[in-house]
Each structure stands twice: as C-alpha cells, then as structure tokens.
C-alpha cells in the first residue's frame, strides 16, 4: 500500500501468503519509495518469533528494493564524435512515420536541410510510399494521406539518395534517437551500414537552455523566435530545427565550444535538465548493508534533487552508488522493453542491456493493454510473447539472467476491485481494465511462460529467481543500534546545573529528601545515557525564556526533579512542603503537610516562617519519578515541550545551532487514504458507473451498504502523500550518516520548501534516533500577550488565588452575572481546556476547590472512559470525591503506597492499568494483586 495510490495490499499479507505457498523470498519494490520496508521487517520479526515459540525456524528472506524512475543522463549530445567543428557540414533532418516502432512502422516523409559555416545551403524533401495504409491518427497529425504518397518512391529507392545527400555531414535531429533508429533500421534491411556522427537538438537545448519547461520543437521555436510553418511535416520541422541549430551554434561559440568533442566534454546536464528527462521503470535491489545505504542515498536524491512529478534517479548516480546494488530491467515501462517496442538499433539495445544485472519478463496479461493502444504496433498476444522471447534471447546473448516476475499490485485476483476504485478516483479512463497484477504461484508462473519451453520456463521462473535471492544477504531496513546525539560533558553539565539550582532554591544545606531524590534521578539519568536529552531540553527552554517566551512541559517530564532543577519545567514533583525563601527553613513531614499527600503544595494554607517571619513558599506536586523513567530509572525519557506557536520555528532552528547544520530533520509522516475518503471513492465510482449506464440505456448499478463498506475497507491505508510531525525533530549524531537509518525528502514532495523530513514515518526509527517534540501551542503566546498587556509576571501569580479559583464555580470575580454572558454559570469560558460544554459540566459536577482539583479534572477530561459512566458516577453516588477518584495514573501508585502496598508492586499495578492489560484480562498477576489490595483496605469501588 506504499506505492502512491497504486498498490492496494498490505505488505504483511503478501509476505504471509508467500510463506504459506512455500516461497523462499519476496522482493519489496514500491514505486519510487521504500516506506513499506519497516512494516515488512516487523512482520518478519513477528513471524520468526511465532515460529521460534513452536520450536521451528522460518526460512524466508525479504529482499529490499525499489521500482525506481530511472532517467538516462549518460547519453551524450553527440554520438560518434570525430572532432568536427561547427563550421563543417551538417544535415538537419526530420521524418514522419506511421508509428513509433522503427522495426515495424514505415517512413512516409523525409525532410532535410544542409548547413555549412552556420548557413543553410541545400534542402532535401520527399514523400515515401510506405506500402501500407497510413493510420488515421497519423493522417490527422501530419495531414499526409494515402493519395499524397501513392506515387512516391519506396524507402529502398529513396533512402540511398538521402544518405548520399548526408554523406560527409554530421546528422542532426530533434529527438535524434527516434529519427536515427528508423534510418539505421531501414538502411540495415537494404544492406547499408550507417556510421555517422549524430547530434540531438533536444539534448543540446537542455544543455544550453536548462530552465525551459519543456523542449518540444514548438517551444524552442517560440523561445528562439524561429518560424515553424506546418508542425509535424518533415520538411517544415527540419527547416525550423535547422534555424534553431544555427542559433544554438552561435550560443556554443559564445561559450568557447568550437567543436563536437568539446561539446561532449562540456555538455553535461544540470539538475534542471535531468528532472525533465523521460523516466523509465527500473528495479534496484539491495544485496547487502552497503547496498541498502546506497539505495537510500538514491531514494533521497530522487526526492530532494530530481523530483519532477516522479522521484527520478539519474543513471550516472546509479553508477556512482552501484556497490551492493542489483539492477533489473523492470516491466513494460522499463528502458529495455520500450527500446524493443520502438525498434531501436542493435547497438542501442546492447548499450541498454549492458547497464542491467538481470532482465525481466512478465505474464502476457500484464501487457495485454498494449494491444488496445493505437500508437503501438502490438496487435495480439503472440506479439507480446515475441517481445518476451526477444528479452530471453538478449539474456542468453549478453550473459544476463532473465527473471519472470508478476509485478504484484494486489494480493488476490479478486482484489483488483480496490485498485480499480483507486485508479478511477485518480481519473484514469481505463481503470476498469485491470491487468492481472496479483501474486502468482510458481505453477501459475510456469504456465504463463510455457511458450518458452519447459526448461527455459523453469529457468526464468525458478532457477534465476533463486539466483537473485542468493545474491542478497539478509539485512535490516534500519540500523538496529540506538544512536543518541552527543554533547560533550553533558553528564557533568547536567549535574552542575541541577545542584546549583537546588542550592539556589533550598539553601547551602539541601534537605535530605531533595538530596536523595536528586541524586537518585541523576544517577539513573547519567548511567543510562540520558543526560544529553536533558541538556538539549535545557538549552531549548532557556533560549526560549531568554527570548521572552515561557515553555510548557507536557506530560510526565514534570515528575522529574532533575528536570525542575535544570529549568526544563517549573513543576516541582516533590511531596508538598513549605520552604522559606529567606532562611531556607523547610517542612516536609509535619502532620499539617502530610494531610496534603498526593495533592499540591499550593493548596496548603498560608504560613509564616517560624524562624525569620517571612511568608513561606508552598511547593511540591507529589509526582513519583517512576512515572517518567520507570521503577528502575532505565526507561527512556520522553521530554515533550510546548513552545509558543510564534516561537516554534525559532526553537526548531535552534536545534541546528546546537547540533550543527545537516544533523537535524523534521520527523516524517505518511498520509494514507482514511476510512471516510475510501468510502467516498467507492460511492463516487458506482455513481459514475450508474450515470454512464443511464446514458447508454443500461440499468443502474445497485450495491448494498455492506458491500460498499467491504470494498472501502480494501482501499483504506493506501499511501496518498507524505508530511511532517507538527513538532518532531529527529537528531542525527555527528559522524553518522542519515542513510544508515532512513532516506530523506521534502514533505509532500514540495520542491519549494527547505524543510527536509525523514522518508520513513518517524515511529519506524524512534528506537534508533532521538526525536525531540518541540510543539507549538497557543497558551505560551497568550501568556506572553497578557504579560505585555498587564505588566504582571505570570510566574508570580499565586496558584491558590481565591479569586482565580472562584472562576470555576461562578462569575462573581469577573464582575458580571451569568445572564450577561448568555446564561453561562461559570467564569471559565475563556480559560484554555475549560471552556467547552463538556468541561464546564465537569466543573459543575465536581465543584473544584483547589488547584490540585483542576489537575485532576484535566486528567479525567483527557482520559478514555474515565469520566462518563465511571468517575462521574462514583462522585454522584458519593463513593468518591474529585480528590479521591483516580484521575491520573500517578494517583494509583501514590494511593496504593499510602495504603501500605510495596512500592514496586504499586508501580506495576499502575502500569498494567494504564496499558489496558487489566481491563482486557491479560494481566496474569491481577488476582494476586487484587487480594493484596483487599488485604490493605483498598475499597471495592477503587479496585
């Protein structure tokens, strides 16, 4: 499903089917992308695990590759150069033909202009009797009909005259490969060998004028102010091409290029020209780890440098990164197949074949559509078989293995309906004529190739496919090791920052609880190699604060005292306590303080320092460190930060300052067809079919709702586009290459943006590379604006302000009545997260008194099925209050420890509940834990 709106089967289903059939391997080759690799790998890992549990070994290999869009940038502007200067003689010619194939189609007109010393000196023009009727489409295009060529000379009569006209001259044509292939083919049939220098004005124009949007003859004539009188008439096209060529000769002299040899030396295509080349399909397989990296380099280049409707890969780049790669000739859209259909010369075909490591043929049904094409000489299935026979002959002649492949786009024959729907949605008129691009069995493939003879059929279906498989090592699509970024002295840096800040807050002698908690955290963080993550977050937050914007810490990072002391979060996770800002008196353990265990220190009553008389600070939110880094402190921290949406882009840019240019990438995402979109595709398809039937007097197509839903289900999750995580930044350690992990690209292939994302969905590589969550949020922006408007520092606003808390119960503090604001009873309408009907109903049900109540309400509002029919009911029945109900996962661990349960057991219960293991009945320890909770007086409603 990762071939863009083309493939419709999950890679996991294809792999499982191949294994059931006893196949030894399967190659994953999506169009232009490699985004199915990680799913394929995870499928294999799961299957190998399942086999291992049964004491069996799964002998199956994934071959990782791509069906690339290959462009040939290796063609030289001048073929067979012999040092001719541009003052020599040139014959600029053009042909009109009955079709595109030099092998079977005929020449109907030859037009030529001789150029010497940059001046037109002679002309040659003649019709040619093709001895067959001129197809109607050719007559429409050229306005040449059978009457006009009836009495013209035949090709065997006129071609020698034309070649005599060209003798000693360099031949020039627009898209010379087409015209010269006809000349060479027809000359060979009458025993004449054509060995001349040839210049292609398309390639020459691409070199001299790389920024044109295309290089059609009429485009060039307009650009160079050349007259083109009757386009698609040989004599007029040749004259126009000659005028263009003369102007381009002057441009060559201006560049100090006086002859054809120097033209070939200088005339290399730039990126713009390469992007405009016609693409061919080509299979590229990675045979080993080096090949995988080189494959990713090619995929990245195709998306970043050469994308033009398709991610194109130049041949020269393939040659540069060829180590570890196996190159196949692909399908009917491949370069070799096209050259055979178009009747290219033997020399050209030999050049093409020699580029590939193996050649491909496919079932006749795959290419049956060619029989219906007016512009293709293929008339029947035997013509298609002959093309495959020719490829087999070329394989034998050049020593290239020929492999029979089935070009799988869907798993089973009946699955074509999904692709039909998708193709129709893209506007293809022939969507209903689906080729049999399903996964074939070995027997089916042998039957498809039986016209080759049983021995040769077995060779291409079995022997050679296994030969390719044996050339490929078992590899993983992503380097398996963890590669965190490195910041020099990050361990000591974090320790110093935290200890200095702790002393600033708690005084020269730290309370024992602070020392023990901080030391435990720092030891866990540093010993597990996580200090760099804290330092990165610290640098980003401090930079934002210095620039005037607060940063909100999301989620469980607030449970880390090290994060508090590093300035990453203002949330203090210690148990509630009093602290004197002047003399550092503290109170963690008085009965008055213990009463607020599991709550928030800011909810405690105001108090004066018994030592110096200063007002005590009320601190601590009682969040266990285990919720962040696990019970043993070895869980990887997930530091999510909310930056101002106005500042987010600057924070992203600052990561490049921290790590260096080219070391950070936006986290990539893959957009697929959603359920409703798929349903819309199916509905539209059948509506349009019914409308067409109505015009043709046929009955409408009626599909039951369940059938529409079934078909829509098969269209879900097909790749549609790519994008970027709103705040995710992937960090590559210095000294590493991104292609060890993933290719890269622009989001949605937008070539106008400088943003570069990972090609793989970021979830596929988040175990290998660090992803920073630098999110944009409105709240820090609003706080900054309010600070500017009022002059009040938001960090100095007391969290126990009675007036502020009253907003969650009535409107009196605002100086207005409910009837003034449409009957709204609360003053929370403008407070983020609390202004919805659902949230305000929660407020009215729970009647929050304290700041900790608001935290609990936020937990209930964002959980799944924890309020409606759950906590709400318990509160209404009087079994619980907002203070005693389970509102966050931390509540479970803290409460169970308070009830006397072992801390590790309390942690495990919390995690099993959080992960849904208890609710789904998948927690085998639950009966034992439940009894333990009962024994410790935990009420039934809580359990």
Which residues are covered by each model-predicted region?
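N-terminal accessory regions of nucleic-acid-interacting proteins
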Residues: 41, 45-88
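Conserved non-catalytic scaffold segment of RNase H-like nuclease domains
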Residues: 86-196, 210-232
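Catalytic DNA-binding helix-loop module of base-excision-repair DNA glycosylases/AP lyases
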Residues: 542-545, 556-568
